[in-house]
Amino acid sequence: MSQDISFLKQLLDAAGPSGFEVRAGRVWRTEASTFAGQVDVDATGNSFAGLNVSGSPHVMLAGHIDEIGLQITHVDEEGYLYIAEIGGWDPQVLVGQRVTILGKSAEVPGVIGKKAVHLMTPDDRDKASKTRQLWVDVGASSRDEVVSLGIRVGDPIVLAQSMIHLAGNRIASRAIDNRIGAFIVLEAIRMLSDNLPAARVTAVATAQEEIGQSGGGARASAYQLEPDVAIVVDVTFSTDVPDVEKKELGEHRLGGGPVLSRGSASHNSVFEMLSSVAEEEEIPYTIQASPRSTRTDADGIHLTRGGVPTGLIS
């Protein structure tokens, strides 16, 4: 277990915003190569680990490895960096955060700033911050000094946060969405590697889910693999927190077991199979209604080629 947690921490701490997943992907593939028979990466940045490549049917297990981040859009004459969002952010959480700029030759620390509250009008104090109003300060005094640090427009940025342990055998990390899914699908085939199944099983750490339309890199990976069935592992909302409407989202407690999606991209036969296995193994689970898109890799995978029966576990 300690070895598993060590790998999970290494994976969670690796920088890998959408479109720049190379660091996190390298960590995942290095671990996969210790037991998987076939390890690869494609042009999109999807990483693959396969077992029993001649087996049948072909089962695809997918968890996206990218995280939300930021990207430099402009460097002004005073050396401040202006930013845009990679993926969906609440800009309020960005103010004052320490960040790491993934520069060409080095990782550069910085801090996100905004106009001091003392300088705001009363009306401005009540307004929510917008990302375009924020900047990153790396300590430079000019644009030339920023350039000398190896920083360029387009460089990605992540929060400077490592995984931490919380009470109740829980953890927190900036990249749990969805590095945890990439971890789970790899651990699943690790468990299978000691006693190979009849099926061919491929774990995929997919790229660009946070910014992808209709499945991001998952669509490209499913197109290549042509699986007979796919199971996507992603995160969802825990509703045992304040101010959440259970009538809309359902009742899903942290630690209450997996959440199985039903509807839209989730094939009913795969849902029934997953729920039956959970009941046979006495694994508690809840059901999440997904009448439209799931906003996960399942949306892209299930419509690939002639269609792929897909399940979604959160």
Named regions from a protein language model:
Residues 1-314:
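N-terminal hydrophobic/helix-forming segments and targeting peptides
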